[in-house]
């Protein structure tokens, strides 16, 4: 449970909270299970704070420093986290439905099993983030950096990954049905047994990507760069490869 003194300091205002954090760097504030619905924490220093199981729905955390904070099982639905620093934060099984994380920094964060359905992650930095089993259905990841991200078994159905960077990302067994990957960069990405049915991969860069046993039924791969891609055992029924065929050298269509 939350430390009542820590909670009182948080609610006393930005000036007192900031001074206390500066004067007591050895203390890791405990705000677990706290009801912080709609609270304004814009720009606050929440680094290393325990917010597990807290309710931060509709909270304002714009440009907040949440580095290494613990948000396990926290409710952050509809929260505003634009340009927030969530690097190395633990957001496992957190509820981030419809949260706005535009331009946020989540490098190496733990989002295993997190619910990001409908979340805005456009231009966010998600390099080396762990999103295994996460729900990203209808999420906006336009121009996001997902290089080396772990997206195994993630649900990205109808997600917007237009011009996203997915170099070396692991999307094996992921659901990318009807997702937009137009102009996305998937250099050496792992897409083994992924569902890409009806996905939009127009002008996508799939150089050396592993698409073995992937489902690409009715996928749009026009002008995609598939040089060196592994399509062994993939289901390509109805897929459109116009302008991309000449780039496929590892497998015959």
Where do the protein language model's features map onto the residues?
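Tandem repeat scaffolds
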Residues: 7-8, 16, 20-253
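Eukaryotic acidic, serine/proline-rich intrinsically disordered low-complexity regions
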Residues: 1-12
């Amino acid at each position: 449970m939350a430390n009542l003194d820590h909670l009182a300091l948080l609610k006393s205002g930005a000036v007192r909270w900031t001074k206390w954090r500066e004067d007591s760097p050895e203390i890791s504030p405990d705000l677990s299970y706290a009801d912080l619905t709609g609270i304004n924490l814009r720009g606050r220093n929440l680094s290393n704070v325990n917010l597990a199981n807290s309710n931060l729905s509709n909270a304002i955390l714009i440009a907040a420093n949440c580095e290494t904070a613990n948000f396990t099982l926290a409710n952050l639905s509809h929260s505003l986290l634009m340009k927030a620093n969530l690097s190395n934060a633990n957001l496992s099984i957190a509820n981030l439905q419809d949260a706005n994380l535009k331009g946020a920094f989540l490098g190496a964060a733990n989002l295993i099993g997190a619910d990001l359905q409908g979340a805005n992650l456009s231009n966010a930095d998600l390099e080396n983030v762990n999103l295994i089993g996460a729900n990203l259905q209808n999420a906006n990841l336009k121009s996001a950096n997902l290089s080396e991200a772990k997206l195994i078994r993630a649900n990205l159905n109808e997600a917007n990954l237009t011009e996203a960077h997915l170099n070396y990302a692991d999307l094996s067994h992921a659901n990318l049905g009807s997702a937009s990957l137009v102009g996305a960069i998937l250099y050496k990405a792992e897409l083994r047994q992924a569902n890409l049915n009806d996905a939009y991969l127009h002008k996508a860069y799939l150089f050396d990507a592993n698409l073995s046993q992937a489902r690409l039924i009715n996928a749009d791969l026009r002008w995609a760069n598939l040089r060196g891609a592994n399509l062994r055992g993939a289901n390509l029924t109805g897929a459109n490869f116009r302008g991309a065929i000449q780039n496929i050298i590892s497998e015959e269509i």
